[in-house]
Curated annotation (Swiss-Prot):
Homodimer. This is Paramyosin. Its main location: cytoplasm. One of its GO terms (cellular component) is myosin complex. It comes from the Eukaryota. The gene is PMY. Residues 19-836 form a coiled coil. InterPro entries: Myosin_tail (IPR002928), XRCC4-like_C (IPR014751). Paramyosin is a major structural component of many thick filaments isolated from invertebrate muscles. It is found in: Cytoplasm, Myofibril. Pfam families: Myosin_tail_1. Belongs to the paramyosin family.
């Protein structure tokens, strides 16, 4: 019993279908019926043996009483006829039992073969379910791997953000260097141009990094979309599990309803037993009344037994032997009663087993409900974690957007600075021509450049070390989020301070440059009067050309960004198309799997139809068996009637013996006791007949219950089959709708890809036109520069007068660059030379002002 419970619980845990459980219960019922038939056959054989013994005793008795009278001969003939009939009935019963046993064996073998085939099919379904489970586990592992990759990508993005912060600090340092070098801009044209070129290149690199960051951002968004799809698939799997659980709950409700029906049937049987006991009590009272009447008749006929009492003593001895035989039959019947009691106890034990199974099923249902609650809690936690990750992702996206805005602001400020530098260059171009002798500053600036390069290299090494430290501290990322936010706030404040400081420095530079321009204009106004109009016109043209060139560069950059965005969108569309194709393949595989499931369900329906037909055939066989049992019961009733006739004949003989012999009252009393014993035996025979009737009724009730259960099983199978077919049809419709949607999305993606390709081609043509315009403007710029060179040569020819003063200025500047601690001596020599040469006084004052400005800038840089 415990093993059977363990098997049942194991099958429920593994998710066996209710059809297998019903088939197993049906097999058990058939085995129980087979055991009952075997027991009935054993009892029938036992009864046949007892009847043969009784027939032998009766034959011996007939042989002994052969010479009594013609009545005895007639009785012997009747008994011989009855014996032959009984033998024929026994042979027929044996043949019927053998045929029934053979048919039952054949049916049992066919049922076992069908059940084995169904068990094999169920094992195949189990293997498929395990394969599906392994595939789901692999998919879950892949999703976890993708999640780890997304987290790593997130960590790398944050490390890149820190790298951008470090780059911003470097940009701050570079802007500080630019601020320090802006004081020397009037004397370092070539150096400033080279540094501007380097800054533009660094800016382009930063823009390329921003593009790479945008690509990584798009990749992260695609990974997030994949994760969302995986979560949707997990939700669908959970819905499937919930549907399976609901089906299991329905099966449990059906089993509970059947158990209640069986309990009601047991109550009905108890009511019938009570009614039968009441009928037996009424029959007992009626028989007792008849017995009292017969005893009164016996007392009336007792007087007539005095004559034949001597003749009937031998018959009384024979009756004693028969009474002994009847006592033996009584013992056997008591054994049968004990067997029936044992069967009743077995039925009670089976009822207890059924209640235990129901309790186990309830416990399993509670465990499944608990598991479902745990799964729902886990799903809620996963959803909350997913929402937190999405919030973090949105926050990071906002931070990246802020950084891109800040970088764009810095780019705009850099462009403004470049424009201002161009304006200062155009304003100071004439002065820079005259200050070409300041090449000695070049070596110092190169040394400073080397120092800056070494400092930049050191900063890059420090950046690498910081990146290594960040990789080492990736595991503590969750604890450092608050610190990162504080750092970002500090960076924002630093950027604001930097912007304010740059604006202040730019204003100071503009003021100093304006002052220097005023000074140089006051100094050079005498030399520029002739060519001022032409130079102003050329400067206006040059500014217009520079602005057009800058606008074209901006448009080129915007077009390049647009092209990159279109390429990224095209790549996204390609990825979406690939994802749609993969989803299409997955849906095709699901459709094939569902078609196979539909075929399996059809095969299961066919098997259930076969089982129904077999059950109907078994029902017909059981009906035939019941008819045979009714025939045997009828034969037993006929035998009972014959025995009652014999008892009546014997009572007549006893009456005659009482009339013949009145003196033997004590023997008559003994015969009366024997008659009472025979009456008790008759009562026992009647009870046996009533038991047989109750057994027949019970078999009829069981047959009705079996038919009802078969009808319920057929209705349940048809209902479940229709429900599964409808469910699968709905699933097929949903998959077809999803397939149509995916096809529509793929078509839209192809149309968008074609549209983007057309836009890309149009932008390419526009960029080519812009390049042609740029080349034309470049030609115009070259022509204007040639004109400017011609004007410059004319200015140089006019400025040959001031070469002596400029040579003195060069010597003084070289002395200042070689040794700054000799500045006082250089000033004294300049004053001496100023006293010697009058027209060079203004140049010396200009040099002194430049030196003072450079010293002030160096002091500020040191501070």
């Amino acid at each position: 019993m415990s093993e059977s419970h363990v098997k049942i619980s194991r099958t429920i845990i593994r998710g066996t279908s209710p059809s297998t459980v019903r088939l197993e219960s049906r097999v058990r019922e058939l085995e129980d019926l087979l055991d009952l038939e075997r027991d009935a056959r054993v009892r029938a054989e036992r009864n046949a043996n007892e009847m043969s013994i009784q027939l032998d005793t009766m034959a011996e008795r007939l042989d002994e009483l052969s010479g009594t009278s013609s009545q005895t001969h007639d009785a012997i003939r009747r008994k011989d006829m009855e014996i032959s009939k009984l033998r024929k009935d026994l042979e027929n019963a044996n043949a019927a039992f053998e045929t029934a046993e053979a048919t039952l064996r054949r049916k049992h073998n066919t049922m076992i073969s069908e059940i084995s085939s169904e068990v094999e099919n169920l094992q195949k379904q189990k293997g498929r379910a395990e394969k599906d489970k392994s595939q789901l586990m692999l998919e879950i592992d892949n999703v976890l791997g993708q999640l780890d990759g997304a987290l790593k990508a997130k960590a790398s993005a944050e490390s890149k953000l820190e790298g951008l912060d470090s780059q911003l600090t470097r940009l701050k340092a570079l802007t500080d260097d630019l601020q320090r070098q802006m004081a020397d801009a009037n004397s370092a044209k070539s150096r400033l141009a080279a540094e501007n070129f380097e800054l533009v290149r660094a800016n382009q690199e930063y823009e390329a990094q921003v593009v790479t960051f945008s690509k990584t951002k798009a990749a992260l968004e695609s990974q997030l979309d994949d994760l969302k799809r995986a979560m949707d698939e997990d939700a669908r799997n959970r819905l499937n599990l919930q549907t399976q659980l609901s089906s299991l709950q329905m099966d449990y409700d059906n089993l509970q309803a059947r158990y209640e029906e069986e309990a009601e049937a047991a109550g009905n049987l108890r009511n019938q037993v009570a009614k039968f006991n009441a009928d037996m009590a009424a029959l007992k009272t009626r028989l007792e009344r008849e017995l009292m009447a017969k005893t009164e008749e016996f007392e009336e006929l007792k007087r007539k037994l005095t004559v034949r009492i001597t003749e009937l003593e031998d018959m009384a001895e024979h009756e004693r032997t028969r009474a002994n035989n009847l006592e033996k039959t009584k013992v056997k019947l008591t054994l049968e009663i004990k067997d029936l009691q044992a069967e009743n106890e077995a039925l009670a034990a089976e009822n207890g087993e059924l209640t235990h199974r129901v309790k186990q099923a309830e416990n399993l249902a509670n465990e499944l409900q608990r598991r479902i609650d745990e799964m729902t809690v886990e799903i809620n936690t996963l959803n909350s974690a997913n929402s937190a990750l999405e919030a973090d992702n949105m926050r990071l996206k906002g931070q990246v957007g802020d950084l891109t805005d800040r970088i764009a602001n810095l780019d705009r400020e850099n462009r403004q600075l470049g424009d201002q530098l161009k304006e200062t260059k155009s304003a100071l171009r004439d002065a820079n021509r005259r200050l070409t002798d300041l090449e000695a500053l070049r070596s110092q600036l190169e040394a400073e450049r080397d120092n800056l390069a070494s400092a930049l290299h050191d900063a890059e090494e420090a950046l690498k070390e910081m990146e290594a430290k960040y990789v080492a501290s990736q595991n503590a990322l969750n604890h450092l989020k608050s610190e990162m936010e504080q750092r970002l706030r500090e960076k924002d404040e630093e950027l604001e301070n930097l912007r304010k400081s740059t604006t202040r420095t730019i204003e100071e530079l503009t003021t100093t440059i304006s002052e220097m321009e005023v000074r140089f204009k006051s100094d050079m106004s005498r030399l520029k009067k002739k060519y001022e109009a032409t130079i102003s016109e050329l400067e206006v043209q040059l500014d217009v050309a520079n602005k057009a060139n800058a606008n074209l560069n901006r448009e080129n950059k915007t077009l390049a960004q647009r092209v990159q965005e279109l390429q990224a969108a095209l790549e996204d569309e390609r990825r979406a198309r690939e994802a749609a194709e993969s989803n299409l393949q997955v849906s095709e595989r699901k459709r094939i799997a569902l078609a196979s499931e539909v075929e399996e369900i059809r095969s299961q329906l066919e098997l259930s139809d076969r089982a129904r037909k077999n059950a109907e055939s078994e029902l017909n066989d059981a009906n035939g068996r019941i008819s045979e049992l009714t025939l045997s019961v009828n034969t037993l009733t006929n035998d009972k009637r014959r025995l009652e006739g014999d008892i009546g004949v014997m009572q007549g003989d006893l009456d005659e013996a009482v009339n013949a012999r009145k003196a033997a009252e004590d023997r008559a009393d003994r015969l009366n006791a024997e008659v009472l014993r025979l009456a008790d035996e008759l009562r026992q025979e009647q009870e046996n007949y009533x038991r047989a009737e109750t057994l027949r009724k019970q078999l009829e009730i069981e047959i009705r219950e079996i038919t009802v259960k078969l009808e319920e099983a057929e209705a349940f199978a048809t209902r479940e089959g229709r429900r599964m077919v409808q469910k699968l049809q709905n699933r097929v419709r949903e998959l077809e709708a999803e397939l149509d949607g995916e096809i529509r999305r793929a078509k839209e993606a192809f149309a968008n890809a074609r549209k983007y390709e057309r836009q890309f081609k149009e932008l390419q043509t526009q960029s080519e036109d812009d390049k042609r315009m740029i080349l034309e403007l470049q030609d115009l710029l070259d022509k204007t520069q040639i004109k400017m060179k011609a004007y410059k040569r004319q200015l140089e020819e006019q400025e040959e007068v001031s070469q002596l003063t400029m040579s003195k200025y060069r010597k003084a500047q070289q002395q200042i660059e070689e040794a700054e601690h000799r500045a006082d001596m250089a000033e004294r020599t300049i004053t001496i030379k100023r006293t010697i040469g009058g027209p060079g006084s203004r140049a010396v004052s200009v040099v002194r002002e430049i030196n003072s400005v450079s010293r002030g800038n160096r002091a500020t840089s040191i501070m």
